[in-house]
UniProtKB/Swiss-Prot annotation:
Protein location: Cytoplasm
Keywords recorded for this protein, A-Z: Cytoplasm, RNA-binding
Gene3D superfamilies recorded: 2.40.280.10
UniProt similarity note: Belongs to the SmpB family.
GO MF term (any one): RNA binding
GO cellular component: cytosol
Organism of provenance: Baumannia cicadellinicola subsp. Homalodisca coagulata
Superkingdom of origin: Bacteria
Main location: cytoplasm
Full protein name: SsrA-binding protein
GO process terms (BP): trans-translation
Disulfide bonding pattern of the chain: none
Cited InterPro entries: SmpB (IPR023620), SsrA-bd_prot (IPR000037), SsrA-bd_prot_CS (IPR020081)
Length: 161
């Protein structure tokens, strides 16, 4: 019998989600990227004081950067560190993923949006989506579907009592 090594199970803990992005955009494809962070930023992520609602991804010189994300620093006694909560943070992607993102954004008119921020085995990761903006009637249709699902759940709950 062969020695079988147990496969590693990755533990995922969500830090924050951008709930508005599913309402505003059609998500075509999703990617996972690492984030280059400073020490105080990691502590802020662990405390959960981060907002990615108004953030976006900028592709520059074949690199991806997260702009507009707010990581508030913890209140600590250290005064020698200059905190910049709105600084741009480099995203760590493979070359093939970057080429895919660049091609979709430049040729087809897509945009790249952050969907969620989470821990995967003690590494901070961000889920990116290649997205196309929704029109107003698409948003209304989405609201109608969501309300219908809620009403349907209420009706079936009442029937099965």
């Amino acid at each position: 019998m062969k020695n079988q090594t147990p496969c590693r199970v990755s533990k995922i803990t969500t830090i924050t989600q951008n709930k508005r992005v599913r309402y505003e955009y059609f998500i075509e494809q999703e990617f996972e990227a690492g984030i280059s962070l400073l020490g105080w930023e990691v502590k802020s992520l662990r405390a959960g004081i981060v907002h990615i609602n108004d953030s976006y991804i900028l592709l520059k010189d074949s690199e991806a950067f997260l702009l507009g994300a707010t990581l508030r620093p913890l209140i600590v006694a250290s005064s020698h560190i200059l905190y910049s909560p709105m600084r741009s943070r480099k995203l760590l992607l493979r070359r093939r993923e970057l080429d895919t993102l660049l091609g979709k954004v430049h040729r087809k008119g897509y945009t790249i949006v952050p969907i969620s921020l989470y821990w995967r085995n003690s590494l901070a990761k961000i889920q990116l989506g290649i997205a196309k903006g929704k029109k107003q009637y698409d948003k209304r249709h989405c609201i109608k579907e969501r309300e219908w699902l809620l009403n349907k759940a209420r009706i079936t709950k009442l029937v099965h009592r």
